């Protein structure tokens, strides 16, 4: 089929759409990892920067003790850091991902360093330090085995692509392999650090306002941020709330930092001349705080007395004790209070002045928010939106693993400390601790986190998930997933985090979120062109060197004029103020265009708040836009002739494309289409307004009137890029009802197709469609997602008709059985069985692969062992049926006597009603030297009644009837549909996109071309109609059809044409279940639950019971709930109604309650009822049973 597309152009479409798609081709097609680049870059930074920062950035103290006049400290230093390629245990042969999967081992590499142990002896009196090396530096000391991300910079597939073996060349990577399983670390939302945000909390009948900042140095990759909170209480007093102090007035703390007088404090907080309302409120707050005007020394004394700490100051001398407390206070104020605020001078006192100004800045935000909420003053700011993407950061793989590495590295140092203390006898000859470093501490911690998904805190659970290989799109979508962490059930009930927020435009797909209560809106998927930044600490010196001399530092700024300047922030650190902000902003932006600064640096100039923020931190959502200058698009189609890649385009035309993060996005004027810019220019070129009469004709109440002129700054490359990976493949999604797009997102992940090209070398649990086809009608984005290589569906001839009115009611389908016999929608299911030889630690005996011998093996199952070979497994192409043993394993009995059977059976049994065949057997040996047998069994899945299908418009249905082709509808040309769907599915669901797909697909099939169904591109239906008429078809795709059962012509024309349908994994063969007899539970004696355990079918206590009673089938009800369930025969005392017990060695029963032996009745009850009476008795509730003999006798 030709690869040219049908060009349906709108007469209003005056811009070159093809040039914009050619630009998108540059972005996606040259780099197969572009969709997982954020994970790859983050992991590379974890290896190259985060681990060295942890190992070399701390003190690495393993032991410290104080004597009378000196402090003796032992520490480690790490140099020559490096990581080796992943290898097998022999450290000679390279390990590749496919080998790790086969051998059930982790794909990891050894991280090594040159380690030196030091002894520091500090003289307390003279403060001099004497340092010496203990032993000698040891090279290539293993620190840990680090899991390696597949296709990252340190993966063997990247290091040695020439011998990559049979790995799929289309695989994008971005996942880990832990114990043979593929694991993906999901991206996690978190609140923005180093930015004060104002929120409210409910306190009885009032709202309390507070401003909070999560403070962590920008250069620090991992670590827990220090929370700094300023609260306004109900009495309008403003207090400081941090873990180190008791409740204390914020103004006392400001004085302790160095701003002493009330006048200086007020000037630092607000502009006295312009903000009268704020000044009145501030005076009320200062009076309510009951803080007298004290000096800095007095304020420090107050703060020292307010320290809330477990640290004890045991010195008996009050002066020494006070000095110790002051030193500890100084340490808190220097290291733990707003650690991200620094002057850059290295002077702690100047740093404190900066912190005082920053706190005043926080108070200013708090007061403005309070005035907006309490008095509804419009010019003041409202509270911050905690759901806005502006106030969020995304934690990627590198940062998450870095946090775990730091946690387990500290544990490793603690283990070294314990060993050192036990071995250190004399400080003159201390032991060398380097040989006792345990790399397993970090290795096991990282492996366990990736295996379980638990990354430490309560809100960091489920971050690592098994990579689902259902189809290619499903696997790839894991890499684009972002989750909102929820701590407990109370946060799960909140609705606001689930809503689609306007700041998610362009960054999160509006359609891709799971259905159902638990995860709807909390699990999101990134849009196609969205990226996430990583930390760029190398950019900080460049920015700081440029700003030297261009801003006024805070210590030299005039406090009374402080608010007349624009504040300049770098990663949340207030560097200073300036009047010349336009030049600074333009210069930095020009440096960003020229490449002197990274394109990912954020430059946010907020005119309303007079603040200029520069960001180099990681976790910011960012995407490229076309730039617009003077309402003219800078991008020209001829530029594409000079470049071959995206990076080359950025280098050759640096000012055409700009990367914009979410906060900077708030200050741009974005044109969704280039036509918007042309319309604005058209309005601008109109004759200006010269009279009041012309002014009155303008609708001034409508800001979006056609006469309003807009000056744009940026333009979308194409608006279809706001959709996600899966929804980009929906044809014409802008013509469908919105929920249908969400449904299709969930259906597409369940569709059968071809999930990876090397599936023959793997043993995944998945499905393979025999004849997957590229859709006739698809969006341009489909080639960026790989669906043209790994399709998941077939082009089907679909008729919309009720036909007989019986076979396809509701969402059921009539399907052409003859097409199925020819291979239509046939698939194979792949099932995996695996057994590993295990060692019994108690007896040191190992299990054995063999065909169990009934004379030697005990506990043989009720299964067929005849399919096994002598090696212990069924050979390739052996037909397997339900109950056949596929892998034979026996465990030796450690305590068996010579006359007993020596082995116990532990074989794997095939359980499925659908027969299969052994497709592949893989025999390997794991790292421990034990054999592994992996078996892949395939079973053919022919479409059957009840199997589920879905179109790409979310029109899902199940097969209701399989009709022979002779009974199907047919047209005069002999066209017979593959599927007939009910017309009632269209009016309510309004999936017009599917109708357009069918109409355009008909034209494409006739002309032998592919159709363009890209969203947000105009479709000229009249042009399609004309083309169909020219080809000899009815203009709207309707055809005269004949009844296949009687040959009569149908009185109405039928809409028929090609529509792409997906076969989903929900099939009757996997769900059909019935049971006559089988195993029961030990406690309740009822059938277990579930098809896999041969369980029973539950008759509910309400619905089914009431329905059976209403039908009058009481005997049937009794039979199913008692006779065929947990029937139990017992004896009951007629006198007291309690259970009677049989007298030992006698033939009669007695009641232990009333000693009755004559009036005993035998009854039949459900065993569950007997359990209920016993459980009630355990809480002192005695249940009594009245039998037929005593039912008429009233009880006292």
UniProtKB/Swiss-Prot annotation:
Pfam families: RNA_pol_Rpb2_1, RNA_pol_Rpb2_2, RNA_pol_Rpb2_3, RNA_pol_Rpb2_4, RNA_pol_Rpb2_5, RNA_pol_Rpb2_6, RNA_pol_Rpb2_7. Residues 1074-1095 are annotated as: Disordered. InterPro entries: DNA-dir_RNA_pol_su2, DNA-dir_RNAP_su2_dom, DNA-dir_RNAP_su2_hyb_sf, RNA_pol_bsu_CS, RNA_pol_bsu_protrusion, RNA_pol_Rpb2_2, RNA_pol_Rpb2_2_sf, RNA_pol_Rpb2_3. Its main location: virion. It catalyses: RNA(n) + a ribonucleoside 5'-triphosphate = RNA(n+1) + diphosphate. The keyword Secreted does not apply. One of its GO terms (molecular function) is ribonucleoside binding. Its EC number is 2.7.7.6. One of its GO terms (biological process) is DNA-templated transcription. It is found in: Virion. Keywords: DNA-directed RNA polymerase, Metal-binding, Nucleotidyltransferase, Transcription, Transferase, Virion, Zinc, Zinc-finger. GO terms for cellular component: DNA-directed RNA polymerase complex; virion component. Transmembrane segments: none annotated. A zinc finger (C4-type) spans 1133-1154. DNA-dependent RNA polymerase catalyzes the transcription of DNA into RNA using the four ribonucleoside triphosphates as substrates. Belongs to the RNA polymerase beta chain family. This is DNA-directed RNA polymerase subunit 2. It comes from Acanthamoeba polyphaga mimivirus (APMV).
